[in-house]
Amino acid sequence: VIADRSTLRTGRPDPGEALWNPGVEALPTDRMRRLQWERLQRQLAYVYQSSAFYRRWFDEAGARPEDVDSWDAFTRLPILTKDDLRRAQAESLAERGDPFGGICCAPRDRVVRVNATSGTTGTPTLYLLTAHDVAVVNEMHARKYWRAGLRPGHVMLQALSLSMFTGGLPLSQGIMHLGAAVVPVGVDGGSRRVLEFARLTRPQAVVATPSFGLHLVERCPAVLGCDLRDLGIRWFFAAGEPGGSDPAIRSRLEQGFGARVFDHTGGGHAFHAITCPEHAGMHFVSADHCVLELVEPGTGRPVPVGDGAEGELVVTFLAWEGTPFVRASFGDVVRVWTGPCGCGLPGLKLSIVGRADDMLIVKGVNLFPGAVRAVLEEFVPRVTGHFRIVLARPGPRVDPPLRLRVERGSGVEGEALARLEAELVSAMRDRLRVRPAVEWVDPGTLPRPTHKARWVEVEGDG
């Protein structure tokens, strides 16, 4: 039976308990690894038996599930990419009139939800969930928010996109599963609507991208006539883009909201993580339902998961019925830590560095837009924090110098602006090994993001 609920909690814990499911979340690493291996063997057999796509995937690799008799053998299986999944989706639609027929493993009458990746770099990739899979997702959201302090009786304002975004409906359902109330305002109505509902509902918690969170801080005085920190918000949960773990961005969010800030990841699937008060990486909370690997971007060669290792994230879902991903990569580059955490909890921690397809190469230096943002944040309020990397043509290779369009802070002009530019260029050179050419624009010039921030602009696009 693939729908193994043995590590899902039944009923809610006492509000005084620190963890939603302590028997699983505090499981020693060696015991968790044994559990993963047992579930992996069942998962591989299940997808082979249930999916024409996965049978072909195994056959083309010259392997069968029973051949995967070690973790090393598992890493020799091919890596699935979004392109592979999109192609299977298109082929199934063309051949059968059914976009789900090739990769869905569960009987269709057991499917209760269709999720999709964001589709920011192409056609959205669809994946299906059964009621069991939804229960797994709900559990993982509850684990994250419970350990951050959210409890039944609290109210969370959901300010992420609700339009097929994996952090939309699934996240809202997870909040309800914990026993808290959700205000699913979303971002599609803009910042004014979000702020008005924050005033009306007085939530204790808000979830949004870091960029949109900072935009709310900026807009609140004009919209509500008060600072956002005056609304009594206690938690801000950052999601959807890198930034929530960056000390400078976290500090601005803490000050703007008057709240504790937690970075976290995980929407409608089995990969979930959240920071603890130590802010030394996000704790991987879903290891009982997801195997995490690292590989070299571009080559797919395994990267040992050791303290400080960095690589492209590869995930495999465990005890998952609908559309289980096996050795799937969606392009996220992460850094991991395996040593003890000051909070006392075992297991792996990680931070999201960026997306592999967002990486730029400037004179041989690999550069993620999030790293540029992190340096700029250190100069706030002399800069607003809003910027664009301007490219003559799509990356990853960039003809030097790297062009930055940066909003200056209010009142920063003349000699003060010249000094700021010299300091900024020096910091970029020292920290990122890149010397940019800076174009200054007035405060408020660049569009403010409502969903995931777009920091790269290709001249002539649109």
Task: Indicate where each model-derived feature is located.
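Nucleotide 5′-phosphate-binding alpha/beta core
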Residues: 1-116, 122-139, 146-147, 403-405, ...
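Conserved ATP-dependent adenylate/AMP-binding module captured primarily in the ANL superfamily
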Residues: 137-155, 190-203
